[in-house]
Amino acid sequence: MPAEAADRPGDMADATIDAFHRGAFFLAQPAGRGHRAGLDAMILAGAVPTGFAGNLADLGAGAGAAGLAVAARCPDARVVLVERDAEMAAYARRSLALPQNAALRGRADVLAADVTLSGEARAAAGLCDRAFDFAIMNPPFNASADRASFDDLRKRAHVMPPDMFGQWTRTAAAIVKPGGFLALIARPASLEAILSALAGRFGEASIVPIHPRAEEDAIRIIIRARHGSRGGPALCPPLVLHHDGNALTSHADAICNGTASLFGD
């Protein structure tokens, strides 16, 4: 996902323009600071079925990586990039304005809104009840006790506030239609908190452990669950990212470059 040179107007002078899905779409991202999208966002996007057709909310979208990855792979998907940080929302708008993303622009929008809002405040911000068929989220999942960053933009993107999973899944349950889906990526240590937050809201949770290499412990989990279902969770076969070296496995490469879905659907 190399950075490419581009014209950078005004307050985007510190942006890099980065290719994803082997050039299927591009992102404007802050250079040398803040959160920069990578494999996590691409794997999360892979949790959406290739044949998905409907409205999808990318909650905490940042510059738009996961949502635009869905739009690039699913030609009938309509995506809203939801981001509360004004600076990152500006990068998401810049991403949509890139000429390389012209084919996606008619199916994607940016909404500056706080995912933790509730009730009338949430609806007034543009997150209306039952407006979406699918929601994805890559929320901050570093504990506040973890090594702190001196980069405020990065810290806002990475540090988990109290009851975050409860607040974010509450919003997802409000905006996703019954029978729709939520997919999220997190650390394995958060599994209990996530399942607790999903309880009574989303069921049939399919859990995919993400391993750097076959012999190494999982570093991420992907969970996909159905709104309104009472079905129990299921542990799925893992996704192994790398061979013994740093090259991606064929399965991981297909998912991360938009030619396959994580669940094979």
Kindly give the residue locations of the regions a language model identified.
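Mobile active-site "lid"/loop adjacent to the S-adenosyl-L-methionine
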Residues: P139-Q167
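Conserved SAM/SAH cofactor-binding pocket of Class I
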Residues: D40, G46-S149
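SAM/dcSAM-binding transferase cores
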Residues: D217-D265
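Conserved beta-strand segments of alpha/beta enzyme cores
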Residues: F26, R78, R107-D109, G203-S206
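Conserved Class I SAM-dependent methyltransferase catalytic core
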Residues: A28, R33, A37, P162-A218
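Class I SAM-dependent transferase core
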Residues: E4-G51
